[in-house]
Amino acid sequence: MSRRSPKLELKLNLSPPTSSQRRMVRSPSRSATTSPTSPPSSCVSSEMNQDEPSVRYSTSPETTSMVLVGCPRCLMYVMLSEDDPKCPKCKSTVLLDFLHENATNANANAAAASSGRKTRRN
């Protein structure tokens, strides 16, 4: 970037995950030795079985989906849990989910219709 052209263009190209990739959890390779500072129940200190595949499917109820959203108030993109989507900076719940735009618009239209307000159709 030079002083004559301070304009910087960045593009983020993301595609929605396929249904087979949504429940897939990748585990990083772990050390076979335990650290003295890690508790024995820590995932860092647990040993990885050589016969165990490195890709596992999660059946745990604690695993939540993540969504990539934009906050119109802070003008930033963040990746958040789908269960509790709030902007980490301003705590706003008004977020733009651009990967699932059609589902979000359908939910917004249904909520507006149930509250008695009219929505503008495109």
UniProtKB/Swiss-Prot annotation:
GO terms for cellular component: nucleus. A motif (EAR) lies at residues 7-12. Residues 1-62 are annotated as: Disordered. Residues 27-46 have a biased composition (Low complexity). The keyword Transcription applies. Residues 1-10 have a biased composition (Basic and acidic residues). The keyword Nucleus applies. Disruption phenotype: No visible phenotype under normal growth conditions, but the double mutant seedlings gir1 and gir2 exhibit excessive root hair formation. Residues 47-62 have a biased composition (Polar residues). It is found in: Nucleus. Its main location: nucleus. Expressed in root and shoot meristems. One of its GO terms (biological process) is negative regulation of DNA-templated transcription. Keywords: Nucleus, Repressor, Transcription, Transcription regulation. Acts as a negative regulator of root hair development redundantly with GIR2. GIR1 and GIR2 may function as adapter proteins that associate with GL2 and participate in the control of root hair formation. GIR1 and GIR2 may function as adapter proteins that associate with TPL and participate in the repression of root gene expression. Seedlings overexpressing GIR1 exhibit reduced root hair formation. Interacts with GL2. Interacts with TPL. This is Protein GL2-INTERACTING REPRESSOR 1. It comes from Arabidopsis thaliana (Mouse-ear cress). The lineage of its organism: Eukaryota, Viridiplantae, Streptophyta, Embryophyta, Tracheophyta.
